[in-house]
Each structure stands twice: as C-alpha cells, then as structure tokens.
Amino acid sequence: MGNSQPELADGFVVFVKRDCPTCELIVPVLEQLCESKILQTIFTQDDASFPELPITSDDTSLEVSFSHRIETVPTLLKIQDGIEVDRTVGWSQDTWKAFLDIEDLGPENIHSYSPGCGSLSVDPDLQGTLQKKYGS
C-alpha cells in the first residue's frame, strides 16, 4: 500500500478494456501503433489477453490505472522521463494523429470519433478496495 505510481516507460501508453465498444473499435489502430513501435504499452483492465499484442500488459488489478487516475478508456498518455506530460481521453482520430504526430492512423473505414467508456478504476463498487490497496 502506498501512493507511489508504478513507473511507465517513456513514450506513449494506452489504457483499454475489452468491455468497451470504443476500445474494440480501435484495435486496428492499436495494432498499427504496436507494429510501428510508436506505442510502448497497452494496459488492459478486464481481460489480460485484450488486445492480443506483444505490448499488452495485464492491469486487471487496476493498480496502474488507479494510480494514474484513469477515468475513461481509452486514455492515451505521453510519458517523458517516467512522468506523464500529456493525455488524451476517448477516441478522436484527428486528436490522436496530432497527439502522436503521425499522418495515417487506422483503416479508412474506422469511425473517426467515439467518446470511450468509464474506467474500472473509478467504478464506485471498487473504490474502497482500490484505495485500501493502492492509497488515494
């Protein structure tokens, strides 16, 4: 128990969960970002195998999501020197392109906007347990 945040690798990391239509929608985007090595880690909240990519990291304990105050999935973070310097919440193709500084992102037929879903780390039924385990 403590208030220290788990350290994140420099670059871009994203938080997702399978039980979110927006996160399912952007799987092709996550695949592209993984293949191009733009994305460092995908933290998944509810299914350790989602998405099935080599950079997917199990956050079903919600420790990383809770400590980084993730309220919505997907949330894309920019990390420098181990510290979050910026974030974007939900899926907006134009916003993600600008955030990642890339021109082509996702398949042509992908919906360009979806607001995302509530993060499990802010689920009222889990708050007490998460605060006891990981601090406030």
Where in the sequence are the language-model features?
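Non-globular targeting/processing and membrane-anchoring segments
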Residues: 1-11, 19-21, 25-39, 66-73, ...
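Thiol-based oxidoreductase modules, predominantly thioredoxin-like and allied folds used
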Residues: 37-61
